[in-house]
Curated annotation (Swiss-Prot):
This is 3-hydroxyacyl-[acyl-carrier-protein] dehydratase FabZ. NCBIfam families: fabZ, PRK00006.1. Its EC number is 4.2.1.59. It comes from Rickettsia conorii (strain ATCC VR-613 / Malish 7). GO terms for biological process: fatty acid biosynthetic process; lipid A biosynthetic process. One of its GO terms (cellular component) is membrane. Involved in unsaturated fatty acids biosynthesis. Catalyzes the dehydration of short chain beta-hydroxyacyl-ACPs and long chain saturated and unsaturated beta-hydroxyacyl-ACPs. It catalyses: a (3R)-hydroxyacyl-[ACP] = a (2E)-enoyl-[ACP] + H2O. The active site is at H49.
Length: 145
C-alpha cells in the first residue's frame, strides 16, 4: 500500500519544513513500515549545515525514522486523531554514511515491542543500499488534552 504526502498529512501532524517523510512504500500494520525522504538542496537546514558542503543532520534522520514509526502506530491503531505520539528514548543511534542533497533516504521501521501505550522500534535509513543511520527508540501514545 503506497501512501502519498497528502495522506501522510492526514496521519501525522508534522508540516513543512519539519515533515520528513515523502511517501510510504509498504506498510504491514502492527509489524513494519518502509518509506522515503527525498533530500533536496532547498531544505532550510542546509543554509547552515553546512553551506560549503550540505549534510543532512543526524538528528533529522532520526526524526524521519520517528515520523515513519508514528505513521505505523496510526495505521496500526486505525487512527490517532485523538492521540499524540511522543518520542521517549533514542538508543544506540549510529551514523554510518553522509546523506546529502540528491540522495533518497529509504527508511524502515519495525515494531520490536508494544505494551499498553508504549511502543519500541528498530529503524534504519539506507541510501543506495548502504546503511546511513540506525537506531532503536521508544514512543508513548497519549490521549490529547
Amino acid at each position: 500500500m503506497i501512501i502519498d504526502i497528502t495522506e501522510i498529512m492526514d496521519w501525522i501532524p508534522h508540516r513543512y519544513p519539519f515533515l520528513l517523510v515523502d511517501r510510504v512504500l509498504k506498510i504491514d500494520p502492527n509489524k513494519s513500515i518502509t518509506g522515503i525522504k527525498n533530500v533536496t538542496v532547498n531544505e532550510p537546514q542546509f543554509t547552515g549545515h553546512f553551506p560549503a558542503r550540505p549534510v543532512m543532520p543526524g538528528v533529522l534522520m532520526v526524526e524521519a525514522m520517528a515520523q515513519l514509526a508514528a505513521i505505523l502506530v496510526a495505521k496500526s491503531l486505525g487512527s490517532t486523531k485523538n492521540k499524540e505520539v511522543f518520542l521517549m528514548t533514542i538508543e544506540n543511534a549510529k551514523f554510518r554514511r553522509i546523506v546529502q542533497p540528491g540522495d533518497t533516504m529509504h527508511i524502515h521501521a519495525v515494531i520490536d515491542q508494544q505494551r499498553a501505550n508504549v511502543w519500541k522500534f528498530s529503524s534504519t535509513v539506507t541510501v543506495e543500499g548502504e546503511i546511513a543511520t540506525e537506531s532503536k527508540f521508544t514512543a508513548m501514545i497519549k490521549d490529547k488534552t
